[in-house]
From Swiss-Prot:
This is Structural polyprotein. Residues 69-84, 93-114 have a biased composition (Basic residues). Residues 59-114 are annotated as: Disordered. It comes from Middelburg virus. Signal peptide: none annotated. Belongs to the Old World alphaviruses that usually cause fever, maculopapular rash, arthralgia and myalgia. Structural polyprotein: Translated from a subgenomic RNA synthesized during togavirus replication. The chain crosses the membrane at residues 697-717, 774-794, 797-817, 1235-1255. Residues 363-366, 399-401, 521-524, 553-559 are annotated as: Interaction with host Mxra8 receptor. Keywords: Capsid protein, Cleavage on pair of basic residues, Disulfide bond, Fusion of virus membrane with host endosomal membrane, Fusion of virus membrane with host membrane, Glycoprotein, Host cell membrane, Host cytoplasm, Host endoplasmic reticulum, Host Golgi apparatus, Host membrane, Host nucleus, Host-virus interaction, Hydrolase, Ion channel, Ion transport, Lipoprotein, Membrane, Palmitate, Protease, RNA-binding, Serine protease, T=4 icosahedral capsid protein, Transmembrane, Transmembrane helix, Transport, Viral attachment to host cell, Viral attachment to host entry receptor, Viral ion channel, Viral penetration into host cytoplasm, Virion, Virus entry into host cell. GO terms for molecular function: RNA binding; serine-type endopeptidase activity; structural molecule activity. Residues 41-75 are annotated as: Host transcription inhibition.
C-alpha cells in the first residue's frame, strides 16, 4: 500500500444542479460597479489625523477627577417584566430560590478554527471504541488514513468495513476510499514553507522542520486530526505530542516530494483517547481512577489499600489506581504533577535490611544499605545503583531532599543525605537520587561501595565486586568532555523522576521474630507490643495464637513456650533475593526513576593529519592526543579493510588505487581519495622523456616495448651482417678456387675484395639480357618488392599503436540516432556523465546529458527475531518453617525452580524459623529482557531480492531535471515531457547475504541460529519478535544452587550474555568493508551508490525538444584551436572555436569521437564568431571531431599529465594494458623501426644481388 495519496478530486461535496423553474422570475441583471475614485494620499492622512484628535478629546472629557472613586461595573441583568402584585396569604410563605451561578460563556472559535471545522465537516470521521471517541480518520486524496495506535472502528458504515493495511514505520493505517466518497476527500501537498498552519484548535507553527502549538491546545483524542494550509490542503496528520514547556511539539506524518516522512520529537506521547479501565474489589467493578471509599485511600485503610492494589497489579489501570489511592484530598480533580508528586508512591513502601557480602570490614552482615543491583547500560558511563535504603524521604514518607531513611531493627529512621558516599577506586559524582536509586559517574575500578552515617553516628557500608569500565564513545578515548568537538548519539540516565515505563516489584514484608516483647512476672508471661502489631504463638495451656497490639498475659506459662513476631502488612518492600518472601505470593509494583534515554554527547576531535600525497598513495602524519582509531578501506570489488588504534605521533602510508580509498581518522567524517595518472617526463619530448613518461604510467608495458625494440634492432643488425658475409663468400669462392682469376670491379667493391678477372656489370647485364631475360628483370623486382613489403608493415604497425582510449569522466560516447526514441546505457557510478548527440532529419542535433545522482539498493527483509542483553530476575525466596513447599511452573523464559530442605537451623539468621528441622526454601529464577533492550538490541533478518532505485539527472536542450525510479525495466519516470524507463541492471548483485544482523546503524553479514534454537553464551541466547512482545525465548544455562547455611539468598550459575559477547567479537561491519564503494545505511536497510554494473535506459524524447534547421544558426568556416589540455583530470582541456554565422542563437555541441567528451552541451552563437569550450580526455594527443550545429571540424591537442597525485573526486582512466601512444612517441618509434628496416633491407639487397650474379654466372 502506497502511503502517498493520489489527488483525483479536490472539490467539496458534490451537489446536483437545481432543475429549471420557469415560473420563477429571473434574477436581476448584474451591472459592474463603477471604478473606484483614486484616493489622494495627503487627504487620507489628514482624515486619519482628525479622527484621532476627536477620539482623544472624547476620552479626555470622560476622564474622572482624581478624587472620584471608580464604581464597580455591574453585570448586565435581564429586565424582568413587571406584573401586578398578588395577594399573599400571610400564613403561607414561599421559600426563596437560591441564585444560580452564571454559566461560563463558551469561547467563540477563531477564524482559523472555523475554517478548519468547515473543511473537517466532510473529510474526517470519528473512531470509536466501546462508544467513546478515541481518535479520527481522515480522507486525503484517494485514501482514508487512520493512526495505527488509535483503537476502534470508524464511525461510518462504508469506511468501517474497509480492509486497512498497517505500517508500523509510519504508525498509520491506509485504505482506498470508496468511489462515492472521493468527493469528500481533501487535497494534500508536500509544500511546507515555514510559517503558520491551521488545525482544529487554532494555529500551528512550522519551523526548522517541526510542528509546534501552544501547550494545552492539543490533548489525547486529537490523534488523526489533519493540519491544513491556507488553501485548505492537508500538510500533515497529527499522531501525538511532546510537552516542551511553553509549547508542545507535534508528532505528525507528512509528505515530502516523493516519500512519506514521520516526525517524532523526543518524549512524544500518543494522543489517542484512553478508554477508562475497570478495576476489581471484592467482585465490585469500578473506575481505576476513582476507587470506592472503602478503602478510599492509603491513609484511611493502609492494609486494605495494599490488598486492593495487589489484586489489580496486572490491570492496565494499575497506576491510575495507585495514584488515586495516594491522594486522599481530591482524587477526582486534576492534580498538577511535581517533584513531591513523584514521591507519593513511596508512602506505600519502606526500606529494608538485606544480606551484604562485605560490609566494609571484610565480613558479611545484614545491612540497611545493601546493594541490590548495579546497571551500566548508559553509553556515557553513568551507573544506576539500587540500594535497600530510601533517599529523599523522611520517616513518615514525606518528601525531603536532605534525608535518607533506613531500617533500624523494626523501626524506620532517617539521617542527613550529606553522609551518603559512593566510590570505586575514587569518589563518585552523584547526579541524582530518588527512593532506592542512585545515579552517579564513577572512576574505573573492580569494586563498588555505598555508605552512609546514621543518626547515631554509626557508619554503615556495603561493598560488592563490580568491574566498572567506562565505555569508549566514538572513535577516540577521552576522560573529560571537551569544549569543542562533535555531537554523537548516545544513551544516558535522564534526570527525571516522573512516571516511566520501568518498574520494580514489591511485596509485603515477612514476619520478623523477636522475643524481646516477652517478659515473665510470677507464673505469668506478658506480651508488651510497644505500639507494634505482634503475632504470638504460645504452646502452654490452651495453645493460644493470634495478633495483638495491646498488652496480653498468659497464666501458667514459660517464656520458652511462647514465640512472638512483629507483623507489618501495611507497607511494601522490594522483592529482594536477600529477604524472605511473605506468606502470600501477592505483589505490587512502583515506577523506577531516571529512565535510560537517547541523547547526544560531545566527543573530541583529534588534530587533522598532515597529508603528503604521492603517486598511488598518501602519507598521513598523525598526532593524536589520546588513543585514536584509524580505519581505511579500498573501494574496489575486493575491499581491503584495516583498523588500527594510534596512541603516539607517527606516520602511516596508505595505498590509493585508481578505484579509490576511504579512510576515517578518529571522530572526523570519512575522507575519500582517488589516484590520478601522474607521471614524469613528457609524451611530446625527446626519447628519454617519452620513456620516463610512459614508464611512470605503464612500467611493464614500457619495458616490454623497449626490450622488444632493442631485440628487433639487434636482430636486424645480425641478419644484415649474416647476409653480407654469406653474399661475400658466394662472390669470392669461385675466384678463390680458380688460379689466376681476376675479381670483377663491381664484386670487389661490394665484397671488399681485391679485383680479379671477371665480366663487368655491363657485360653481365648484356649476357643476362641475351641469354635469360627473366633473371635480368628479377634483379630489379626483388629490391622493389622488399621495399613495398616493409612500407606496408610499417603502415599497419602505426595504425595498431593508435588504440582507442576511455574517457576520463564518462562512458563511451554514443553514435547518432535517427529517431526521438533513444536507448542508452549508463554506468552505475555516481558522478560520471553520459553524453549523446541525437540527429533527426529536418532538425538540429540535440545533445543529451545524463548522470546518475544517487542509487539505493534496498533488500526485502523478513524479521526473524530481536536479541539483546538479558536480565535475571530472582524473586525473594519462600522460606517455609516446619513444613514443605512445592514448585509451581510459570510461563517465564528459562524459568527455574527448586526446593531445598534442611538449610536453616533453629532460630538462625534471617530465616526466622523456630524449628530445628523440616525448614525448606523455595528458590526461583527466570530471565527477562533488560531495560536497555529498547535502546541497545540487534535484529536478525532474512534478506531477499533487492530492489534498485536510481535518481538520474537529465539535461536536453534547455530542459533539465532529476527523476527517481526503480531500475526494473518497468517503472516509468518523467522529466517534463521526457519519458524514460530504467533497467533492468546488467549485473544482479547485492552486498547483503541471505542472513544479516542489524545493530544500531551497522549491518553484519553473518549466520545466526533460528528462532527457538539459541545457545547459551552465543548470539540469540535471548529472542523475541519485538522489544515489547511477550514471546520471549531464552537459553542461558540458568541453574539454581543450594543456599549455604548462614545467609538468606538464592545462589545460581549462568552463562554470561551472548549478546554482550557478540558485541566484543562481532568484527567489522559491512559499513566498513562493503565492495564497490557502497555506503550502507539503516532505517531502512539499504546500500547506496554502489558502483557496479550498467543501467540501460529507454528514452522517449518529446518533439518539442528539437529545433528545426531553419530556426538554427548556420555556421561556416568552423575552426578549432586547443589552448590548454591536461589529460586524465576531469575537464582539463580548453579549446576555442572560430566560425562565421548569419544570425545569433544556440547550437548543440558534441564530440563525435570517443577520444574526448565536451563539458558544455550547447554554445551561444554570437556575431563575434568566437567561443570557448571545455573537454575531457584520457589521451596524451587526442584528435577528435567536434560538431557544432551541423558544422564539423577536427581538434588536435598535445596534453600534459595531471599534477595532483591524489584528488577527492573519482576519475576513470585508460585501463587498457597497451597504452595510447602520442604522435611524438609514434614518430620516434617509426624512425627507429625504419632504421632497423633499412639495415635489414641493405643486407637483403646485397644478398639478392650476389645471389643473382651467382645464378647468372652458372
Amino acid at each position: 500500500m502506497n502511503y502517498i495519496p493520489t489527488q483525483t478530486f479536490y472539490g467539496r461535496r458534490w451537489r446536483p444542479r437545481p432543475a429549471a423553474r420557469p415560473w420563477v422570475a429571473p434574477p436581476p441583471v448584474y451591472y459592474p460597479p463603477p471604478p473606484p475614485v483614486p484616493v489622494d494620499p495627503q487627504a487620507q492622512q489628514m482624515q486619519q489625523l482628525i479622527a484621532a484628535v476627536n477620539t482623544l478629546a472624547i476620552r479626555q472629557n470622560g476622564t474622572r477627577t482624581p478624587g472620584q472613586q471608580r464604581r464597580k461595573r455591574q453585570p448586565n441583568k435581564p429586565k424582568r417584566k413587571q406584573t401586578p402584585p398578588k395577594k399573599q396569604n400571610p400564613a403561607k410563605t414561599k421559600n426563596k430560590q437560591k441564585p444560580q451561578p452564571p454559566k461560563p460563556k463558551k469561547r467563540k472559535p477563531g477564524k482559523r478554527e472555523r475554517k478548519c471545522m468547515k473543511i473537517e465537516n466532510d473529510c474526517i470521521f470519528e473512531v470509536k471504541l466501546e462508544g467513546k471517541v478515541t481518535g479520527y480518520a481522515c480522507l486525503v486524496g484517494d485514501k482514508v488514513m487512520k493512526p495505527a495506535h488509535v483503537k476502534g472502528v470508524i464511525d461510518n458504515p462504508d469506511l468501517a468495513k474497509l480492509a486497512f493495511k498497517k505500517s508500523s514505520k509510519y504508525d498509520l493505517e491506509c485504505a482506498q476510499i470508496p468511489v462515492h466518497m472521493k468527493s469528500d476527500a481533501s487535497q494534500f501537498t508536500h509544500e511546507k514553507p515555514e510559517g503558520h498552519y491551521n488545525w482544529h484548535h487554532g494555529a500551528v507553527q512550522y519551523l526548522n522542520g517541526r510542528f509546534t502549538i501552544p501547550t494545552g491546545a492539543g490533548k489525547p483524542g486529537d490523534s488523526g486530526r489533519p493540519i491544513f494550509d491556507n488553501k485548505g490542503r492537508v500538510v500533515a496528520i497529527v499522531l501525538g505530542g511532546a510537552n516542551e514547556g511553553a509549547r508542545t511539539a507535534l508528532s505528525v506524518v507528512t509528505w515530502n516530494k516523493d516519500m512519506v516522512t514521520r516526525i517524532t520529537p523526543e518524549g512524544t506521547e500518543e494522543w489517542t483517547a484512553l478508554v477508562t479501565t475497570a478495576c476489581i474489589l471484592s467482585n465490585l467493578t469500578f473506575d481505576c481512577s476513582l476507587p470506592p471509599c472503602a478503602p478510599c485511600c492509603y491513609e484511611k485503610d493502609a492494609e486494605g489499600t495494599l490488598r486492593m492494589l495487589e489484586d489489580n497489579v496486572d490491570n492496565p489501570g494499575y497506576y491510575d489506581l495507585l495514584a488515586a489511592s495516594t491522594h486522599c484530598d481530591a482524587p477526582q480533580r486534576r492534580r498538577r504533577r511535581g517533584l513531591t508528586e513523584d514521591y507519593k508512591a513511596y508512602k506505600l513502601t519502606k526500606p529494608y535490611i538485606a544480606y551484604c557480602s562485605d560490609c566494609g570490614n571484610g565480613q558479611f552482615c545484614y545491612s540497611p544499605i545493601a546493594i541490590e543491583r548495579v546497571r551500566a547500560e548508559a553509553s556515557d558511563g553513568m551507573l544506576k545503583i539500587q540500594i535497600s535504603a530510601q533517599i529523599g524521604l523522611q520517616v513518615d514518607g514525606a518528601h525531603s531532599w536532605t534525608k535518607i531513611r533506613y531500617m533500624k531493627g523494626h523501626d524506620v529512621e532517617d539521617t542527613d543525605r550529606n553522609s551518603l558516599e559512593v566510590f570505586t577506586t575514587g569518589e563518585c559524582t552523584v547526579h541524582g537520587t530518588m527512593g532506592h536509586f542512585i545515579v552517579a559517574t564513577c572512576p574505573e575500578g573492580d569494586s563498588l561501595t555505598v555508605a552512609f552515617v546514621d543518626k547515631h553516628k554509626v557508619r554503615h557500608a556495603c561493598r560488592i565486586a563490580y568491574k566498572h569500565r567506562v565505555p569508549v564513545l566514538g572513535r577516540e578515548h577521552f576522560t573529560v568532555r571537551p569544549h569543542h568537538g562533535v555531537e554523537l548519539p548516545c544513551t544516558t540516565y535522564a534526570m527525571r523522576t516522573s512516571v516511566t515505563t520501568e518498574e520494580i516489584e514489591m511485596h509485603v514484608a515477612h514476619d520478623v521474630p523477636d522475643n524481646t516483647f516477652l517478659s515473665k512476672t510470677g507464673n505469668k508471661v506478658k506480651i508488651t507490643p510497644k505500639g507494634k502489631s505482634i503475632r504470638y504463638n504460645c504452646t502452654c495451656g490452651s495453645k493460644e495464637s493470634g495478633v495483638t497490639k495491646q498488652d496480653k498475659e498468659f497464666d501458667n506459662c514459660e517464656v520458652s513456650q511462647c514465640h512472638t513476631m512483629v507483623t507489618a502488612h501495611d507497607k511494601w518492600q522490594f522483592n529482594s533475593p536477600y529477604v524472605p518472601r511473605a506468606g502470600s505470593g501477592k505483589k505490587g509494583k512502583i515506577h523506577v526513576p531516571f529512565p535510560l534515554s537517547n541523547s547526544t554527547c560531545r566527543v573530541p576531535l583529534a588534530p587533522l593529519p598532515n597529508t603528503i600525497p604521492a603517486k598511488n598513495g598518501i602519507t598521513l602524519q598523525l598526532h593524536p592526543v589520546a588513543p585514536t582509531l584509524l580505519t581505511y578501506r579500498t573501494l574496489g570489488e575486493k575491499p581491503e579493510h584495516h583498523t588500527e588504534w594510534i596512541s603516539e605521533s607517527c606516520e602511516r602510508t596508505l595505498p590509493v588505487p585508481e578505484e579509490g580509498l576511504e579512510y576515517t581518522w578518529g571522530n572526523h567524517a570519512p575522507v575519500r581519495l582517488w589516484a590520478q595518472l601522474t607521471t614524469k617526463g613528457s609524451a611530446h619530448g625527446m626519447p628519454h622523456e617519452i620513456f620516463s613518461y610512459y614508464y611512470g604510467l605503464y612500467p611493464a608495458t614500457t619495458v616490454a616495448v623497449c626490450v622488444g625494440l632493442a631485440c628487433v634492432i639487434l636482430l636486424a643488425l645480425s641478419a644484415s651482417c649474416c647476409l653480407c658475409v654469406s653474399a661475400r663468400n658466394k662472390c669470392l669462392t669461385p675466384y678463390a678456387l680458380t688460379p689466376g682469376a681476376v675479381v670483377p670491379c663491381t664484386l670487389s667493391l661490394l665484397c671488399c675484395a681485391p679485383r680479379a678477372k671477371a665480366a663487368t656489370f655491363a657485360e653481365t647485364a648484356a649476357y643476362l639480357w641475351a641469354e635469360n631475360q627473366t633473371v635480368f628483370w628479377m634483379q630489379f623486382a626483388i629490391p622493389v618488392a622488399c621495399f613495398m613489403i616493409v612500407t606496408y608493415c610499417l603502415r599497419h604497425l602505426m595504425l595498431c599503436c593508435r588504440t582507442a582510449s576511455f574517457l576520463v569522466a564518462v562512458s563511451l560516447g554514443m553514435g547518432a540516432t535517427q529517431a526521438y526514441e533513444h536507448s542508452v546505457t549508463l554506468p552505475n557510478a555516481v558522478g560520471f556523465p553520459y553524453r549523446a548527440h541525437v540527429d533527426r532529419p529536418g532538425f538540429s542535433p540535440l545533445t543529451l546529458h545524463m548522470e546518475v545522482v544517487s542509487t539505493s539498493l534496498e533488500p526485502t527483509l523478513a524479521l526473524d527475531y530481536v536479541t539483546c542483553e538479558y536480565k535475571t530476575v530472582v524473586p525473594s525466596p519462600k522460606v517455609t518453617c516446619c513444613g514443605m513447599s512445592e514448585c509451581a511452573h510459570q510461563q517465564k523464559a528459562d524459568f527455574q525452580c527448586k526446593v531445598y530442605t534442611g538449610v536453616y537451623p533453629f532460630l538462625w539468621g534471617g530465616a526466622y524459623c523456630f524449628c530445628d528441622s523440616e525448614n525448606t526454601q523455595l528458590s526461583e529464577a527466570y530471565v527477562e529482557r533488560s531495560e536497555v533492550c529498547k535502546h541497545d538490541h540487534a535484529a536478525a533478518y532474512r534478506a531477499h531480492t533487492a530492489a534498485l532505485k536510481a535518481k538520474i539527472s537529465v539535461t536536453y536542450g534547455s530542459t533539465n531535471g532529476t527523476a527517481e525510479a526503480f531500475v526494473n525495466g518497468e517503472s516509468t519516470a518523467r522529466i517534463g515531457d521526457l519519458k524514460m524507463i530504467l533497467g533492468p541492471i546488467s549485473t544482479a548483485w547485492s552486498p547483503f547475504d541471505p542472513k544479516i544482523v542489524v545493530y544500531k546503524d551497522e549491518v553484519y553479514n553473518q549466520d545466526y541460529p533460528p528462532y527457538g534454537s539459541g545457545q547459551p553464551g552465543r548470539f540469540g541466547d535471548l529472542q523475541s519478535r519485538t522489544t515489547e512482545s511477550n514471546d520471549v525465548y531464552a537459553n542461558t544455562a540458568l541453574k539454581l544452587a543450594r543456599p549455604s547455611a548462614g545467609t538468606v539468598h538464592v545462589p545460581y550459575t549462568q552463562t554470561p550474555s551472548g549478546f554482550k559477547y557478540w558485541l566484543k567479537e562481532k568484527g567489522d561491519a559491512l559499513n566498513h568493508k562493503a565492495p564497490f564503494g557502497c555506503i550502507i545505511k539503516t532505517n531502512p536497510v539499504r546500500a547506496e551508490n554502489c558502483a557496479v554494473g550498467n543501467i540501460p535506459v529507454s528514452l522517449d524524447i518529446p518533439d518539442a525538444a528539437f529545433t528545426r534547421i531553419v530556426d538554427a544558426p548556420s555556421l561556416t568556416g568552423l575552426k578549432c584551436e586547443v589552448a590548454t589540455c591536461t589529460h586524465s583530470s576531469d575537464f582539463g582541456g580548453t579549446l576555442v572555436v572560430e566560425y562565421k554565422t548569419d544570425k545569433v542563437g544556440t547550437c548543440a555541441v558534441h564530440s563525435e569521437s570517443n577520444t574526448a567528451v565536451m563539458q558544455e552541451t550547447s554554445l551561444s552563437v554570437t556575431m563575434d564568431g568566437r567561443g570557448t569550450l571545455h573537454f575531457s580526455t584520457a589521451s596524451a594527443s587526442p584528435s577528435f571531431v567536434l560538431k557544432v550545429c551541423s558544422s564539423k571540424t577536427t581538434c588536435t591537442a598535445k596534453c600534459v599529465p595531471p599534477k595532483d597525485h591524489v584528488v577527492p573526486f573519482p576519475a576513470n582512466h585508460n585501463n587498457v594494458v597497451f597504452p595510447d601512444f602520442s604522435s611524438t612517441a609514434v614518430s620516434w618509434l617509426t624512425h627507429t623501426m625504419g632504421g632497423a628496416t633499412v639495415v635489414i633491407a641493405i643486407g637483403i639487397t646485397i644478398f639478392l644481388i650476389v645471389t643473382c650474379i651467382a645464378f647468372s654466372r652458372h
